Amino acid sequence: MPSPAVDLLKQKTASLPNAPISVVAANTFVPPTQPVTAGNQLPTSVPLPVLPAVEAAKRLAAYAAVDRHIAHEHKVIGIGSGSTVPYVVDRILAQGFEANKDRVFLPTGFQSKELIVKAGLTLGDVDQYARIDVTIDGADEVDNELNSIKGGGACQLREKVLAEAADTWIIVADYRKNSEVLGTSWTKGIPIEVVPFAYAKVLTNLAHMGSPHVLPNGQPGLSLRMGKMKAGPVVSDNGNFIIDAPFAEELMRQPEELLHKIKMLTGVVEVGLFCGMAKAAYFGNEDGSVTIRSDDGTISQL
């Protein structure tokens, strides 16, 4: 007898369109003619809900990344965090029940765990699977060398573990996250996860490294991240605090060097700088196209 999880997965996949989307227009309606498989060039489109420009761009990036990087033989898949990731799960579901019934999906945090469970996909964890076929994740900002800032959702530790464990790590984002230098559009600073009893010491260390308490525009700079719907600091899924540390452009142009310096501070658990890890980054654009930056330095357009 099929398990409730199998029944849920069949239900979730049965009504989904099984065809690649068009990247000519984000909300175009054209009947599907081709199954979703990795490597498709996205020549056709399917009926999709009309979304605001930014959301449509996120969906385009996510769908293109799944179509090109999640193949039938991939059985262990990492699911990242952020506002683009729900579209990643949608596109994986569109590959159908047969493609997904033998797969296991590893989350980077509570949000992605909930997405996996609600989709009826099989949930696993990285402590069970030290090697992952593909991880697809969002980013707060990506530079032209595929270095990225992550941790706006306080998940950077698990995100980095799943990124390092993956044979292929792919970033998906909208056009606003595509920058020449980190810190250009994401001005809140580098998210740094610290053990709670060390946060004051780490704040002092970061200030000595050049992270200002007040930005030139008068906005708050270096600070312990505070909760918006609760009194007190944000607490990560691992029970730690998050510090946001902005740095000047000249330091952000050398993100790997900055990463190593911050990581050496006692009390720091993980740093939201991801350097030299991504195979490619997919950016959905306002005009319905997708820009792909690859780790070999090439830039292509869909």
Curated annotation (Swiss-Prot):
Transmembrane segments: none annotated. GO terms for cellular component: cytoplasm. It catalyses: aldehydo-D-ribose 5-phosphate = D-ribulose 5-phosphate. SUPFAM superfamilies: D-ribose-5-phosphate isomerase (RpiA), lid domain, NagB/RpiA/CoA transferase-like. Its EC number is 5.3.1.6. It holds the Pfam family Rib_5-P_isom_A. One of its GO terms (molecular function) is ribose-5-phosphate isomerase activity. Keywords: Cytoplasm, Isomerase. Belongs to the ribose 5-phosphate isomerase family. This is Ribose-5-phosphate isomerase. It comes from Cryptococcus neoformans var. neoformans serotype D (strain JEC21 / ATCC MYA-565) (Filobasidiella neoformans). The lineage of its organism: Eukaryota, Fungi, Dikarya, Basidiomycota, Agaricomycotina.
